[in-house]
Amino acid sequence: MMDPMINLSVTIITFNEEHNIARCLQSVKGLADEIVVVDSHSTDKTRELAESFGAKVIVRPFPGHIEQKNFAVDQTHYDWVLSLDADEALSEELKKSILKIKKGPKYQGYFFNRLTNYAGFWVKHCGWYPDKKLRLFNKNFARWAGMNPHDIIKMKPKSQKGFLSGDLLHFSYDSI
């Protein structure tokens, strides 16, 4: 008998991300079983756009990146979480890799490379790529930690981690 596919929650923290959020949410369409957006009182259309993609939007003050991301994870219904920033999107290859993991994960967390777009150019040098990130994890084995704003996923001891093909596309710099 084949195990059923795991359900996947996607978490995103936001503040005035109307220019990014649709691209991010479009990239997880057909992959996410639940989307939780924790918004820090945006004054633009971030919340409305997120809701138009079916996201559950929770508004609360911003206590810091780590605290806000852990709060978002705590609001999810499923054990498996894909944590994204609003200025990120999945490449098609990464999306396919995650779909394979949904059929039966072998590890408690997964790394993949993040590729940054700087003013319209993909940066694959200067130490910016590969930029390995652990963003897909079983929340029973992981928590956000580190120092704000440089958050990292801290896995429980003896947790196993794998690596997925495909890039997390990072659109953080629109201009110089």
Protein language model regions, located:
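N-proximal low-complexity "stem/linker" segments adjacent to membrane-targeting elements
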Residues: 1-27
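Residues at the starts of beta-strands that form the adenosine-phosphate
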Residues: 7, 33-34
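Acidic helix N-cap motif at the loop->helix transition within catalytic regions
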Residues: 22, 44-53, 93-94
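A conserved acidic beta->alpha catalytic loop
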Residues: 27, 31, 39-48, 85
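Short, structured coil segments at secondary-structure junctions
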Residues: 31, 52-54, 132, 157
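Conserved donor nucleotide-binding strand/loop of the catalytic core
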Residues: 33, 47-75
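Catalytic metal- and UDP-sugar-binding loop of GT-A-like glycosyltransferases, i.e.
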Residues: 38, 60, 82-86
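Catalytic-site signature of metal-activated, phosphate-bearing donor transferases
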Residues: 70-73, 80-84, 91-176
